[in-house]
Amino acid sequence: MRAPNKPLPQAIIEAAEKTLHSEDRLVIRAYGFISVTEYFMRDFIKKVLLKFNKPQLAPALGMIIKELTVNAAKANFKRILFIENNIDVTNPEDYERGMRLFREAISESMALEYGKKAKSASLNVHTTFDFDKDRLIIEIRNNLPMSRIEEQRVREKFAQAMRCNDIAEFMVENVDETEGAGLGHQFLRHLQRTR
């Protein structure tokens, strides 16, 4: 991935370097997922893995981090759109109507607009990197509880991923554009098998 046009603030770069050398936790709070954020996270994880002689894992982890972070941000955007359109996340019919609206609205420009709305609403995505020589924990979460319907869909995706032998099989059998496609879960499962 090439470096983004917009540079990161120097304070963020310095904090990441300090974290890398002290093996402390790094927490990144974002309201969307733009190219500068992606570049920063991929570069940081590459440096962490290089430090512990595991650079071969960097491309796969970079994809997984991007997939899960984008899904967490999209969940926030979806909730904002639902609120704007008076959609009840607990009502299955209303939820399906909201998902149709969301699929129609999702775009790069929508992501920029809703990233600003997410910031105004204090809906963020925290990506935490916690590591030392023995382990690497990456936690990606938004600050919005899932509805019962959303949780059920996530659990179905986990079950589908567990039944598939590889990413290609999963993609052919389980393409579902209503939420995230479930690729992050499948990427993680595949990485666990191959490490």
Which stretches of residues belong to each language-model region?
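Conserved polar catalytic motif of the HATPase_c/GHKL fold
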Residues: 67, 71
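N-terminal assembly/transducer modules of large multi-domain enzymes
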Residues: 2-9, 21-50, 54, 189
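Short N-terminal amphipathic alpha-helices
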Residues: 56-62, 72, 76-81
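Conserved beta-strand-loop-beta-strand hairpin that lines the nucleotide-binding pocket
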Residues: 6-26, 74-195
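Conserved short strand/loop->alpha-helix "switch" segment adjacent to the catalytic nucleotide/phosphoryl-transfer site
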Residues: 41-66, 88-93, 170-179
